[in-house]
Regions:
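Short cysteine clusters
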Residues: 68
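Short hydrophobic beta-strand that contains or immediately precedes a catalytic carboxylate
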Residues: 24-28
Length: 101
């Protein structure tokens, strides 16, 4: 069953390779959530202010991986960044992504 889904939707994103190639992890949770635990080296830009930070993120010129608690807010942030022409991936939960890298 899972091999069928992989064939249908393609292979998953290789987040480890993206990070090794220089991708930036942006954690879009609140500062309080971020302080409670986060991926080492990630940047905290809450989803409610990410629109204001688009120009600065774009200037970095690197792919972005967004994370949050469950994947919902990181999905919203992905949409904002993608519409600005930034190469972006939704890493989902910060805890889940941390276990993949």
């Amino acid at each position: 069953m899972f091999s069928f889904l992989k064939k249908l939707f393609g292979p998953g994103t290789d987040y480890k390779a993206l990070i090794q190639a220089g991708a930036i992890i942006i954690d879009v949770r609140s500062p309080q959530e971020f302080d409670g635990g986060h991926i080492k080296g990630s940047k905290n830009i809450p989803v409610n202010i990410i629109q204001r930070e688009v120009a600065g993120i774009k200037k970095m010129g690197k792919p972005v991986i967004t994370v949050c608690q469950s994947g919902a807010r990181s999905g919203m942030a992905k949409g904002i960044l993608k519409s600005a022409g930034i190469e972006v991936y939704n890493g989902g939960s910060w805890f889940g992504l941390r276990s993949k890298i």
